[in-house]
Amino acid sequence: MPFDFRRFDIYRKVPKDLTQPTYTGAIISICCCLFILFLFLSELTGFITTEVVNELYVDDPDKDSGGKIDVSLNISLPNLHCELVGLDIQDEMGRHEVGHIDNSMKIPLNNGAGCRFEGQFSINKVPGNFHVSTHSATAQPQNPDMTHVIHKLSFGDTLQVQNIHGAFNALGGADRLTSNPLASHDYILKIVPTVYEDKSGKQRYSYQYTVANKEYVAYSHTGRIIPAIWFRYDLSPITVKYTERRQPLYRFITTICAIIGGTFTVAGILDSCIFTASEAWKKIQLGKMH
């Protein structure tokens, strides 16, 4: 006899006239298909959606920056003339710059009575401070009003990512318009290096920060000290890294196969149990009739 390759078929077909459809089996089959469809759509959504995972490590992620951090500052002082407003920068490496003007702009407010300062500058990766003050003015005012609103203060690249909720602009919207006009403001910043890596492996470097602040009127032996808005910063040694990941295709296929196979197996066992119990109940009823 010639070899019959069909012997390897483990999915033997049963003629339809030897099977018995039931209402219970139909209900279980419909529920089974709906359940599989629901799980399939859930897994498909998870497969398409990009997941962002984070990790912490100790290192300087942006070694190509030359030890610099880009800063973007946007602040309004509604009661201080633009010719009096200046930005000073100093740090522990000996930098001391008064009246920084590069990449900065002053926009008059309230018919010239106030000023909006917008600036981009770099700071060294060492503890230091930058402050908005009247120190660079030709003539110092007697009572400079340092009430203000901070629209933006950010470090490094701007990340437009909805999947992460970090404090990249923690001071954005800070309103000190009702504070003491003669008071100085100290913002103590702890800057945390942050790396965002997309699916293509491209990395962007930004910085989150936490902030604590205090308001005070300072005096010395010669009298009251001219107020200023201080941003004192220090860098954290811990780096936060966010990485975009998508579920591998093989895992998605494996999960779908498990869903389909597992659901049909459980549904088959349930249908068999219900059918067996139903047949047994019918036999019991027939026995009572006799």
Curated annotation (Swiss-Prot):
It comes from the Eukaryota. The chain crosses the membrane at residues 27-47, 255-275. It is found in: Endoplasmic reticulum membrane; Endoplasmic reticulum-Golgi intermediate compartment membrane; Golgi apparatus membrane. It is a multi-pass membrane protein. Residues 1-26, 276-290 are cytoplasmic. GO terms for biological process: endoplasmic reticulum to Golgi vesicle-mediated transport; retrograde vesicle-mediated transport, Golgi to endoplasmic reticulum. Its main location: endoplasmic reticulum. It is linked to Arthrogryposis multiplex congenita 2, neurogenic type: A form of arthrogryposis multiplex congenita, a heterogeneous group of disorders characterized by multiple joint contractures resulting, in some cases, from reduced or absent fetal movements. AMC2 is due to a neurogenic defect and is characterized by congenital immobility of the limbs with fixation of multiple joints, and muscle wasting. AMC2 transmission pattern is consistent with autosomal recessive inheritance in several families. Penetrance may be incomplete in females. This is Endoplasmic reticulum-Golgi intermediate compartment protein 1. It comes from Homo sapiens (Human). The gene is ERGIC1.
